[in-house]
Amino acid sequence: MTTKTLYDKIVDLHTIEKLSSDGIERLVYIDRTVVNEYTSPQAFSLLRENGLKVWRPSATLGTVDHVNSSSPDRTEFPTEENACTQVKYLIKNGSDFGFEVLNNGNPKQGIEHVVMVERGKVLPGMLIGAGDSHTAMYGALGAVAYGIGTSDIYHYMATSTLRYKKLKNMRVRVAGVRGASVTAKDIVLFIVKKLGAGGCTGHCVEFCGPVISDLSVEERLTLCNMAVECAARSSIIAPDQKVFDYLEGREFAPKGEMWSKAVEFWKTLKSDDEAKFDKEVEIDITGLEPSVTWGTSPDQNCSISESIPDPASISDPKIRADYERALNYMGLKAGQKIKGLPITHAFIGSCTNSRIEDLRTAAEVLKGKKLAPGVKAFVVPGSTQVRAKAEKEGIDKIFKDAGWEWRNSGCSLCLAMNGDILGAGDRCISATNRNFEGRQGVQTRTHLASPAMVAMASVKGFIADVREE
């Protein structure tokens, strides 16, 4: 009997036809997708030009998230002309082609990846493609998911299938003792640093080990969300009872007898004991501390007690040049301590760290404290439902009492394309996924960290150790 990895099992179950003799090129069935107002317009134009319909409208969800304002007093449509056009076009596409669209004002609106999970649209064993690289996040629930381009969105809409190039298998086993205040964000930043920005190119990464099993589902979502930052096309974690409990009762999760049958099948979704991986890595997180990025790529990070590395110590000329460029852009020096670096802004949000657990941990840090003078901070819940739940728990009051702005759901400051934008020279500690040059505004400097670390920096006025009250 042939042994298989979890990734291979799911892809094989969705394979309609092998298109190459080696089985790498395939035609696969895609279970579901989500579209936003920014990456989907051309796909719908192609459908119209070719007189085609969306093959399975119920498998498609549209949500407004990239270009909408997060302002507390936002209106149904953005005030910026191009953004307004994009939103109206998505709504029209939903109406014309028969799929649900969540716009501002809808109680279910939110960031696409947050909404897909909270509504139970993502289930173990599914194969999902969507027009955003962080689609890989769904692997936290035991699904294979990956980002696709506009032409693939069009092909999926018309056929519910895609031409797919099978990935190699990589297993990352995470072991060791998890220290106090070490979050999933710290763990994934450490993994990305260890593996490098291109360390998982061409692979689906399966995360496993005692540390992974110990993570909550929402922590696993953070982990899988950022696997793409070391170039993994997809990432996955075998579903367990935590996942089943998390999904039960959600809007699109199976009900009644179908739920029992689904769980029975989901329990089979794991790599066989003798399954062969193309690449295996073990990472020990014993001694890991809360971490922060210092450069302009997520792999350029260090623990809070470390100093910024010296490019001269790097043997690879390309990496050395990348470090030098990053230090110049960030206005930092080799050997400088990351701890104590002054900030101007703090942000919590994005598909990486905007769920209810993220807001709770940040609120615990902020309780009874005030923003440091000169620091501006705002929090953007990942969905309108997350926002409502947080308000029911009184979390919004803690943020507001501390001086933070409590805003509406959207991608917001994860990327500077929606009115939430910082200025040249601003330095922001951010619970997002990317710290590229200009990501939050022209010449803005971004430091990635966990929500708890962001909260602590906001009241100190500088990057600080959350373990030190």
What role is predicted for each listed range?
Residues 1-469:
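Fe-S-dependent hydro-lyases/dehydratases of central metabolism
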